[in-house]
Amino acid sequence: MSTLQRRRVNRADSGDTSSIHSSANNTKGDKIANIAVDGDDDNGTNKKIAYDPEESKLRDNINIPTLTLMEEVLLMGLRDREGYLSFWNDSISYALRGCIIIELALRGKIRILDDSARKRFDLSERLIEVIDSSKTGEVLLDETLQLMKNDEPLSISNWIDLLSGETWNLLKINYQLKQVRERLAKGLVDKGVLRTEMKNFFLFDMATHPIADASCKEAIKRRVLSVLVSRNMELSYNEYFPETTSFKIIRTLALICGSYGANVLENVLTTLEYEKRDKAISRAEEIMAQFSQYPFDLEKETELGVSVNLNKEVKEEIENNPGHDLQLEVIAGVFEVFSRMDMLL
């Protein structure tokens, strides 16, 4: 039995938002609030439109980029022309499950169970609860959310193990997410980032996914290098990652930590000189250690002279998005799992 199979386990789910109704008299017990919005009907007269405030919250307060965190990590591991991942990478599958947990937290779907006794446990051992089971439109996220919703609260590390199929619990063996890499690649094809080609490998044909839009991957690389190489971090934005993205700094840190855990970070650093590449890896490890605890240690300054403004930017981002501490605690817990992956694998 491999050491990878000695980990732990656990869950997921998804649900639908409540339907929208308008009425003249709303009672206090109504779950759906009717909020009037002025609009013009066909006759030019003003008309009131009712909508679900939960939908408005997701649309206006949580701005989601085009690509999920899992898709960005997969892109960093893909060979541009060949369109497939390294056959020797046994870390990426486990890391992608962790990225699913982070993505759900960034979207406000899950958080750490608010129990004062939780602080006796490591971050990765704290329990997760679902706070919004509405569908995201991303199949892997919705599948995971549905599993979480239907099960009791389980720890971060339990969930990553379960989604990876690393469990001895036969009742939960079906929690393993199937064909994650292939499904992510097909999602990127649908978004116009990759294309599908059939290539012959000895005796069989295999679907590969070469890069169709090189600008997307280059933008991801620039964002990573801005944090790991530049003295002052300054993120670049595009149609895939707009400036209005919620928690854009923390999402970028999650990309770096997820890529490090998936053993694909060095793919971005191949064009750098040896010394710069070594310093970038050291900075990634420094970030992993700093942000795998919560509250984040924002008083600790980097010793490498790289992205010296990172702490200030993260502090401002958290202050501008109050009330998300328990979601950020989930992210820190996954970072803790990533930091131990060498021992786990």
Swiss-Prot record:
One of its GO terms (biological process) is Golgi vesicle budding. A 1,2-diacyl-sn-glycero-3-phospho-(1D-myo-inositol 4-phosphate) binds at W88, R97, K178, R181. Residues 15-26 have a biased composition (Polar residues). It is found in: Golgi apparatus, Golgi stack membrane. The keyword Phosphoprotein applies. Residues 1-26 are annotated as: Disordered. Residues 197-208 are annotated as: Beta-hairpin required for oligomerization. Changing R181A: Abolishes phosphoinositide binding and Golgi localization. Changing W88A: Abolishes phosphoinositide binding and Golgi localization. Changing S19A: Alters phosphorylation but has not effect on Golgi enzymes localization. Keywords: Golgi apparatus, Lipid-binding, Membrane, Phosphoprotein, Protein transport, Transport. GO terms for cellular component: cytoplasm; cytosol; Golgi apparatus; Golgi cisterna; Golgi cisterna membrane; Golgi medial cisterna; Golgi membrane; nucleus. PANTHER family: GOLGI PHOSPHOPROTEIN 3 HOMOLOG SAURON, TRANS-GOLGI PROTEIN GMX33. Present with 1850 molecules/cell in log phase SD medium. Phosphatidylinositol-4-phosphate-binding protein that links Golgi membranes to the cytoskeleton and may participate in the tensile force required for vesicle budding from the Golgi. Thereby, may play a role in Golgi membrane trafficking and could indirectly give its flattened shape to the Golgi apparatus. May also bind to the coatomer to regulate Golgi membrane trafficking. May play a role in anterograde transport from the Golgi to the plasma membrane and regulate secretion. Homotetramer. Interacts with coatomer complex. May interact with ARF1. This is Vacuolar protein sorting-associated protein 74.
